[in-house]
């Protein structure tokens, strides 16, 4: 069955699969009008065309006497500046005469099986061309001959449409792109609310639900990365939408740099949404014959609530964004030495941690910051990716060999995008540092940024890392970025092209990652940026897991991991057990609670194992054994949010196997108080016709019973307690 239907007579395009339809049409003057995005309809018969009304101060097409048609009031697929549309434009193009007028007129379309790659950018993909179909709509400005190709891909078996734009300069003169959104969509007669994922360093992705008022709202980042402060994701929901019912529209930008989600509610209560690269300090010179490709937006629609939206993203990102050979493999349990030692370590100090990890069943040791150059603190050596022989007198290979002899894999921390003043790299290539001529650059964590937009810089870093990786038996890389961009300038570009620096940095990063992951496909890469400061689908394309937050406090992590799950799969989010009291919050929590929260993602440990009490070591050893047993279920099962730590004094979630024959349920109590109310937990996602046994108590319940009646939570007079339930389907005697 074709996924794209074209009504040639009425010039209507209908993208459809079993769950959704996306419909738009070519209107008067060659303008694209958005008609519908929502649940599946078999056929569109043309009745839902926008009513034509003469509206004051909303002008008409040039040369037309029809006062009822206006681009200012028409719901559109892509708006531009200068055409008497007073909404925020999706695109702004500056011509050689200084004007920014752009009248994009429909020229034609192309349909192809599958999904083409995007040049230089990460994007969702297909493994077989029957999985999806792609529609390209060609729009051209007749005066400048600048062409906009609007790219739509619909998946056959996923509630997903992806969108991006390619701009082609078919004219004779260069133009400047001052804004190019990846997509636009206009809604009429909908009273939506937004769900966004704002945050801060060590406090990322706290879901916020808000109303939409008249005027313009922008959610985005100006930090050069996707940021801790505002994740590149937004959902539009009805005010009645819950976790398990109601319309939910998700928009997830596959990009790791400055981004913007712009909402405009207009005079007619129409909602106008644009998503793409933030136009702040963006100005791209597009020469004659050149093209520019925008990042991709992953759009999801469901009428079954937020959990269904999240599950669509979980499957899509895990299966068709992450490319690594590890995407379907169980991830190793690691111990990282950072919170155990910080910079104060040597080989002799690390070996006991490795020995203890072996005894506890941990599978990988990760050597964090401080192993290279002469780095005893954060003031030096970034850019010098050679081992510090003071700490490893016999070389790094000697220590790696020791780790492997204990039966553990070996991982290492890198921060390749940064440079220290006190480094050999800076002494040799001071021009590699990003700074504005005549001005002192701003430090952050005593470090500075390499200009990754330059090929020479990328080659230098690649060559250093290549030497490190090809001579060592390294199994894992933690790729960190501990500051945001500032002092935006590149000595490789002329003054009139400095507006390209932000985007060229991201493109350079992607090119470097492409080279490394291609050269070393058997190394597991984990992304990090001071925790979750670059937790986005663009990085997931190269790295199948990302450090969710530098905050390892179990209670804080409940909200962080809850919010992360809205748009990203569990297998992407790493979570570690650390010491108590926690080093970020000072909060005390039990080992069992810390373990359960960390086991709700890709489990690891971030502490000095040699300092654990005998009792805690037994808990860790037991928890490692248990996690290994349920690891496929946690990392690749269906995830359901049951109770929100934001709106209640509990958090609860569960993991269900694809066959619905096994489930793990975790219920977390927050603060204790006298005479607490009785609470129940109702499960979801089970087979109502099966019986399930509680593995701990041997009690048997029907699937329908667990979902309809649920069970009472224990009354516990203690803060931050956790109850974990393990159910398996059984045949009742």
UniProtKB/Swiss-Prot annotation:
Keywords: Glycosidase, Hydrolase. PROSITE patterns: ALPHA_GALACTOSIDASE. The keyword Hydrolase applies. GO terms for molecular function: alpha-galactosidase activity. It holds the Pfam family Glyco_hydro_36C. CDD domains: GH36. Its EC number is 3.2.1.22. The keyword Hydrolase applies. GO terms for biological process: carbohydrate catabolic process. InterPro entries: Aldolase_TIM, Alpga-gal_N_sf, Alpha-glycosidase_related, Glyco_hydro_27/36_CS, Glyco_hydro_36, Glyco_hydro_36_C, Glyco_hydro_36_N, Glyco_hydro_b. SUPFAM superfamilies: (Trans)glycosidases (SSF51445). The active site is at residues 480, 550. It catalyses: Hydrolysis of terminal, non-reducing alpha-D-galactose residues in alpha-D-galactosides, including galactose oligosaccharides, galactomannans and galactolipids. Alpha-galactosidase associated with the raffinose operon. Belongs to the glycosyl hydrolase 36 family. PANTHER family: ALPHA-GALACTOSIDASE C-RELATED, GLYCOSIDASE FAMILY 31. This is Alpha-galactosidase 1. It comes from Pediococcus pentosaceus. The gene is agaR.
């Amino acid at each position: 069955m074709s996924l794209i239907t074209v009504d040639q007579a009425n010039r209507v395009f209908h993208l459809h699969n079993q769950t959704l339809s996306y419909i738009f049409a070519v209107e008067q003057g060659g303008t694209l009008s958005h008609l519908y995005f929502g649940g599946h309809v078999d056929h569109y018969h043309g009745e839902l065309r926008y009513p034509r009304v003469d509206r004051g101060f909303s002008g008409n097409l040039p040369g037309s006497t029809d006062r009822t048609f206006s681009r200012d009031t028409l719901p559109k697929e892509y708006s531009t500046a200068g055409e008497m549309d007073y909404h925020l434009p999706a695109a702004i193009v500056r011509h050689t005469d200084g004007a920014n007028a752009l009248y994009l007129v429909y020229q034609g379309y192309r349909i192809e099986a599958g999904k083409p790659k995007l040049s230089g950018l990460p994007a969702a993909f297909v493994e077989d061309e029957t999985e999806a179909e792609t529609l390209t709509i060609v729009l051209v400005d007749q005066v400048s001959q600048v062409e906009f190709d609007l790219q739509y891909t619909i998946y056959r078996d996923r509630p997903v449409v992806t969108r991006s734009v390619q701009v082609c300069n078919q004219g004779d003169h260069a133009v400047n792109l001052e804004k190019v959104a990846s997509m636009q969509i206009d809604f009429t007669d909908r009273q939506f609310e937004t769900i966004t994922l704002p945050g801060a360093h060590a406090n990322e992705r706290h879901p916020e639900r808000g109303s939409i008022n008249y005027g313009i709202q922008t959610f985005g980042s100006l930090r050069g990365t996707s940021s801790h402060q505002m994740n590149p994701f937004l959902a539009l929901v009805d005010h009645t939408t819950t976790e398990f019912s109601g319309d939910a529209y998700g928009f997830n930008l596959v990009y790791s740099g400055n981004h913007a989600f712009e909402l405009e509610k207009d005079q007619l209560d129409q909602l106008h949404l644009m998503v793409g690269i933030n136009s702040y300090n963006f100005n791209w010179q597009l020469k004659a014959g050149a093209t520019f490709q925008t990042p991709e937006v992953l759009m999801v629609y469901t009428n079954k609530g937020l959990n269904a939206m999240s599950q669509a993203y979980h499957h899509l990102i895990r299966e068709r964004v992450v490319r690594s050979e590890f995407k379907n493999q169980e991830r190793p349990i690691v111990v990282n030495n950072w919170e155990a030692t910080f910079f104060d370590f040597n080989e002799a100090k690390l070996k006991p941690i490795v020995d203890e990890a072996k005894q506890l069943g941990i599978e990988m040791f990760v050597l964090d910051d401080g192993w290279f150059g002469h780095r005893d603190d954060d003031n030096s050596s970034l850019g010098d990716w050679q081992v510090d022989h003071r700490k490893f007198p016999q070389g790094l290979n000697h220590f790696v060999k020791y780790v492997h002899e204990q039966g553990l894999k070996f991982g290492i921390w890198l921060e390749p995008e940064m440079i220290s003043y006190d480094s050999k790299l800076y002494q040799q290539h001071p021009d590699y540092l990003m700074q504005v001529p005549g001005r002192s650059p701003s430090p952050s964590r005593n470090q500075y940024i390499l200009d990754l937009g330059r090929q020479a810089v990328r080659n230098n870093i690649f060559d250093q890392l290549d030497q490190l990786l090809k001579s060592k038996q390294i199994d894992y890389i933690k790729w960190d970025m501990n500051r945001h961009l500032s002092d935006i300038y590149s000595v490789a570009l002329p003054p009139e092209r400095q507006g390209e620096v932000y985007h060229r940095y991201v493109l350079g990063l992607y090119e470097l990652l492409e080279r490394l992951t291609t050269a070393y496909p058997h190394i597991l890469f984990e992304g990090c940026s001071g925790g979750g400061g670059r937790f986005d689908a663009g990085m997931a394309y190269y790295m199948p897991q990302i450090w969710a937050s530098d905050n390892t406090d179990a209670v804080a992590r409940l909200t962080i991991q809850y919010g992360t799950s809205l748009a990203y799969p569990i297998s992407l989010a790493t979570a570690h057990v650390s010491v108590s009291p926690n080093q970020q919050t000072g909060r005390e929590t039990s080992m069992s609670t810390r373990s359960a929260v960390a086991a709700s993602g890709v489990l690891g440990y971030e502490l000095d194992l040699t300092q654990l009490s005998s009792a805690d070591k037994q808990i860790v050893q037991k928890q490692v054994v248990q996690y290994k047993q349920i690891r496929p279920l946690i990392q690749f099962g269906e995830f359901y949010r049951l109770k929100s730590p934001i709106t209640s004094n509990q958090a609860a979630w569960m993991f269900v196997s694809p066959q619905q024959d096994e489930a793990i349920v975790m219920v977390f109590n927050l603060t204790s108080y006298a005479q607490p109310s009785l609470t129940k937990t109702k499960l979801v996602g089970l087979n109502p016709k099966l019986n399930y046994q509680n593995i701990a108590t041997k009690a048997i319940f029907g699937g329908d019973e667990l979902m309809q009646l649920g069970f009472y939570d224990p009354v516990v007079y203690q803060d931050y307690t956790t109850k974990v339930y393990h159910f398996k389907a059984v045949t009742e005697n």
